[in-house]
């Protein structure tokens, strides 16, 4: 397929050597020697590598992220005699790339159709400008994966303990170094982002937000860029990923051409699933809008204030803390007299006593704030009667 795509160029300028047997992970010295000699005498060595059926297929799970040793060894040996090495990968999922920093380029083809050879030739020879972006993070090692400690489990049960922290949500939250981040992908040209605009500075969760940004092709070749929009929740209501992809758009630009792209965000773009109401909930507060070329390449940011129209009922039980109650206006009304009494009791110790010197008033206040309701009966002289009659106005 590649030879047909290249036509006469293939016959005149391309020399081929097999290098390894795809059916087994074994170093064939004769094949290896031929490949090294061929690469040594070339201007550029293009190595096709990846995962054979024995390593990756439907019906069973991979046990590691490595490619066949014979392929990694071939790449390392060719790097000894050739500075310009391009690796074309055919694989259905991420692989470890111990040679990634040494090769000139990597073309990730994944598992394409029968015309993949011609498509790869068009990219390698500059007829087509690549514009794909990674839909997954490529970690350095299998052990970096968030599910590593829990999979495959005990043979009978697998626990999915990652929660929402899967993929880039995990790696970016932990600020872990990765081989290639989510949304990453190179081009033969370059793009510049500018003039991020939001349709509103404040919105309700019943409204939509229009986000626009200018993108310019600053290179010499026509190309396409995938502009990615991430949202970061700054309300601190619950633990959430540091940012989440909420929209994206692909724009084609001629050299030095600039266009404005617009994306829309709605309630779901800011929301998380709240089990107290069994619905998607976006809390009131500040949210950051981030525009980037990948999850690790953020170019522009702005903030928007969101007002929630959904009221979350407060569940009060014996383990509810004083600080949680004081954040609720109705609960604060009921708790005011009790809190005042506790504050007075905290400051009522005998002056100069060893206990007063050892435990500061600030420490006692922190202890009070973090104390559950059930502790009121013994904390700072609150009586059982006061505790029993603690009710909230409706």
PLM region descriptions:
Residues 307-327:
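Low-complexity, Pro/Ser/Thr- and charge-rich linker/hinge segments at domain boundaries
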Residues 15, 90-222, 290-291:
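Secreted, periplasmic, or luminal enzymes acting at the cell surface/secretory milieu
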Residues 51-68:
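Glycine/threonine-rich flexible loop motifs
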Residues 165, 175, 187-313:
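Intrinsically disordered, low-complexity Ser/Thr/Gly-rich stretches
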Residues 322-384:
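Conserved, compact domain cores that house catalytic/ligand-binding motifs in diverse enzymes
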Residues 42:
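An anion/phosphate-binding loop that grips the pyrophosphate of nucleotide cofactors and donors
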């Amino acid at each position: 397929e590649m030879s047909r795509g290249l036509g006469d160029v293939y016959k005149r300028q391309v020399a081929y050597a097999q290098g390894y047997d795809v059916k087994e992970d074994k170093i064939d010295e004769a094949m290896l020697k031929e490949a090294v000699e061929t690469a040594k005498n070339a201007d550029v060595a293009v190595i096709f590598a990846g995962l054979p059926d024995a390593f990756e297929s439907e019906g069973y799970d991979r046990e590691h992220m490595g490619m066949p040793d014979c392929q990694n060894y071939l790449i390392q040996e060719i790097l000894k005699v050739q500075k310009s090495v391009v690796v074309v990968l055919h694989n259905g999922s991420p692989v470890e790339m111990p040679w990634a920093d040494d090769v000139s380029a990597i073309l990730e083809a994944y598992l394409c159709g029968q015309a993949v050879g011609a498509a790869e030739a068009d990219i390698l020879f500059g007829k087509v400008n690549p514009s794909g972006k990674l839909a997954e993070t490529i970690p350095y090692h299998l052990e970096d994966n968030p599910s590593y400690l829990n999979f495959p489990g005990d043979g009978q049960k697998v626990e999915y303990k990652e929660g929402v922290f899967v993929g880039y949500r995990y790696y970016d939250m932990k600020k872990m170094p990765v081989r290639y981040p989510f949304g990453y992908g190179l081009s033969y040209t370059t793009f510049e982002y500018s003039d991020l605009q939001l349709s509103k500075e404040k919105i309700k969760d019943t409204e939509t937000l229009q986000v626009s940004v200018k993108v310019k092709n600053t290179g010499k070749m026509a190309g396409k860029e995938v502009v990615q929009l991430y949202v970061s929740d700054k309300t601190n209501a619950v633990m959430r990923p540091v940012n989440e992809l909420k929209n994206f758009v692909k724009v084609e630009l001629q050299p030095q051409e600039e266009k404005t792209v617009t994306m829309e965000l709605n309630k779901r773009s800011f929301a998380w699933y709240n089990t107290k109401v069994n619905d998607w909930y976006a809390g009131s507060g500040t949210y950051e809008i981030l525009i980037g070329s990948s999850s690790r390449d953020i170019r522009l940011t702005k903030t928007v204030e969101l007002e929630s129209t959904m009221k979350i009922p407060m569940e009060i039980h014996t383990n509810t803390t004083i600080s949680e109650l004081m954040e609720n206006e109705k609960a604060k009304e009921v708790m005011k007299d009790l809190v005042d009494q506790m504050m007075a009791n905290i400051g009522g110790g005998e002056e100069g006593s060893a206990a007063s010197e050892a435990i500061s008033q600030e420490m006692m206040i922190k202890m009070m704030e973090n104390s559950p309701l059930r502790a009121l009966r013994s904390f700072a002289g609150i009586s059982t009667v006061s505790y029993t009659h603690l009710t909230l106005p409706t």
